[in-house]
Amino acid sequence: MVNIKYKSMNKSFDVIVIGAGHSGCEAALASSRLGCNTAVVVMDASKIGWMSCNPSIGGPAKGQIVGEIDALGGEMGKAADATFLQFRVLNRSKGPAVHSYRTQNDKYDYAAYMNDALVNQSNLTIIEDMVTDLIIEDDNDSPHVLGVHTKFHGELLSK
C-alpha cells in the first residue's frame, strides 16, 4: 500500500525529479539528503520503485553501478539486500576480476521498501501527477529549465 505524505502542497522546489523508478528514487533521495527541497512527480504512486518482469539487481554491468550508488549512500543496494530471494556469484568459472553479484528480488517487497524510503525522507514531497511540459527560459542563448507543467497541479517551479 502506498502512503503519500503531502507535507505541504508547496509549488516551488529546489529540485523536481520526474519518475520514481530506480534512478528517479536515487535522484530524489540524494537531493533531499543534501538538504534540497525536492519533489518527485509520479504518474502512479503505487509503482514507486517498481521492478520489471526480471526483478534482479546486479550482474556484470548493473552491479558496477549499484556498487557505486551504494558507495555514495544510495538506497538500491540496501533495498536489494533487504528483499532478495536468491543471491548468486556470476562468472565463477572465470577469474575473480570478472566475478559479479546478482540478487533476484521480491518485486513487491522491493517496491514497498523504496516507497517507505521516499515517504519517510525529509525534504521530499511525492506528487502523483503527470508532467505535460517543461517550463524553459531562453536567456541570452543559455536556456534553462524553470519547472514543469503538470496535468492536475499546474506549474511546479524549480531552481
Which residues make up each language-model segment?
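Conserved N-terminal/central alpha/beta ligand/cofactor-binding core
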Residues: Y6, S12, C25, L29-E137, ...
